[in-house]
């Protein structure tokens, strides 16, 4: 029986890169592909419906595999839901209540297609899509804490699980570290310069003083950086108001999620700044690095903003790839695995997941956010012992190649959810 996987592209270059890697991986496992291009919405939807209806007649199976809720609300055209249509909603398991509802018929629900939704960010960024997720959803989170968050606050989602980030390799022959031109590469924006649109009217939270809450929560995260943003917000709310409901806690967490980006930005900037101020040359790409008060430091090389695929060749020419988490405490980031697959020495802040998967100094270097002041010494040590650094990079490459590619993730999805 042929199985076709439906992908959605044409919205974000980073997600297109991940999607192409997953598509390649599933095709090597024997799955057929259909790619819905969001830039050609009507043509893509028509072609998708025809593909599903023709395939269903032949007994084929379909799955949607996508990122960050792309296509969650794909709806059928009205003409296809009228009585006598090949896809009668009553025949597809809809109740009279569903049929009389004003809600547009969801494509995934109508055709009973599992919608496998991989979240690359914290679920609190996706309140509306997750509350309105198709009934056929399987939500895969890249941090174990996010799985708990989904189970607690999104009771409508029946299936959720943990799927770590994965890496992409460009080419198969990688230069030795000694021959590479970039000393330390940081590829990622400073969120503090792009987060303004997320900040709510802090006076609109009647239960507490919003400005005070923002300051207290951010301070707690900075001083105790192993805590999650949602836990600290909840702790503050319950300290101030012991009668606050579960639903209201969730609503305020969503409103105050910008604090997560502030904390991420604080440590990201701190990691790069402490290196350049200690005479280590860092090449940084992404929004915001040219707006810091210390941006004129001669050891900071700012490369501007580039698309996701353009980062991979830069990693291939980097001795060290530096990563800081997007406040993930029980997950990873694709920068880590991309850097390993580029044959670079990866230096990253730790997480419970990374500590289980790797050994500090064997496949990569891990540092605690509480000990960020030791970071320059760790990096100087790598440059001072290039033979052992090369061995670590080689070990990291082998580990990522065997366990942390999108091919590995596709194999897991197949076993667990297909």
Language-model regions, residue ranges each:
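Catalytic binding pocket for nucleotide-activated donors in carbohydrate/polymer assembly enzymes
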Residues: 9-10, 17-24, 29, 34-41, ...
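Conserved beta-strand elements of the Class I
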Residues: 4-7, 185, 345
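Nucleotide-sugar donor-binding catalytic core of glycosyltransferases
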Residues: 9-12, 18, 153-329, 351-354
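Short, hydrophobic beta-strand segments that form beta-sheet elements in well-ordered domains
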Residues: 35-36, 116-119, 138-142, 162-163, ...
């Amino acid at each position: 029986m042929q199985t076709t996987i439906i992908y959605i592209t044409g919205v974000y270059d980073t997600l297109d890169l991940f999607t192409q890697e997953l598509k390649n991986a599933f095709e090597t496992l024997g799955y057929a592909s259909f790619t819905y291009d969001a830039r050609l919405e009507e043509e893509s939807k028509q072609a998708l419906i025809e593909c599903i209806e023709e395939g269903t007649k032949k007994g084929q199976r379909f799955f949607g595999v996508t990122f960050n809720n792309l296509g969650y609300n794909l709806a059928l055209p009205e003409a296809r839901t009228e009585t006598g249509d090949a896809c009668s909603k009553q025949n597809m398991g809809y109740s009279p209540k569903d049929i009389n509802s004003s809600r547009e018929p969801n494509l995934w629900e109508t055709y009973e297609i599992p919608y496998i939704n991989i979240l690359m960010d914290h679920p609190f960024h996706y309140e509306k899509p997750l509350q309105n997720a198709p009934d056929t959803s399987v939500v895969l989170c890249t941090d174990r804490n996010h799985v708990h968050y989904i189970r607690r606050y999104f009771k409508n989602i029946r299936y959720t699980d943990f799927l770590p980030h994965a890496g992409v390799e460009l080419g198969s022959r990688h230069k030795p570290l000694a021959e590479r031109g970039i000393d330390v590469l940081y590829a990622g924006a400073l969120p503090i310069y792009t987060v303004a649109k997320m900040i709510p009217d802090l006076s609109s939270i009647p239960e507490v003083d919003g400005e005070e809450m923002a300051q207290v929560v951010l301070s707690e995260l900075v001083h105790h950086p192993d805590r999650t943003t949602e836990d600290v917000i909840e702790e503050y709310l319950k300290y101030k108001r012991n009668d606050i409901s579960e639903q209201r806690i969730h609503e305020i967490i969503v409103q105050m999620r910008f604090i997560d980006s502030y904390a991420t930005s604080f440590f990201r900037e701190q990691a790069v700044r402490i290196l350049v101020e200690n005479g280590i040359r860092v090449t940084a790409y992404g929004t915001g690095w040219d707006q810091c008060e210390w941006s004129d430091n001669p050891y900071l090389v700012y490369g501007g903003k580039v698309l996701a695929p353009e980062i991979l060749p830069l990693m291939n020419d980097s001795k060290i790839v530096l990563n800081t988490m997007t406040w993930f405490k029980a997950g990873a980031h694709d920068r880590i695995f991309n850097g390993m697959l580029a044959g670079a020495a990866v230096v990253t802040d730790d997480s419970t997941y990374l500590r289980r998967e790797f050994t500090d100094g064997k496949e990569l270097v891990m540092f605690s956010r509480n000990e960020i002041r030791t970071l320059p010494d760790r990096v100087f040590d790598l440059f001072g012992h290039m033979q052992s650094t090369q061995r670590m990079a080689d070990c990291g490459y082998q580990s990522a190649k065997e366990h942390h590619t999108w091919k590995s993730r596709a194999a897991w999805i197949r076993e667990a959810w297909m």
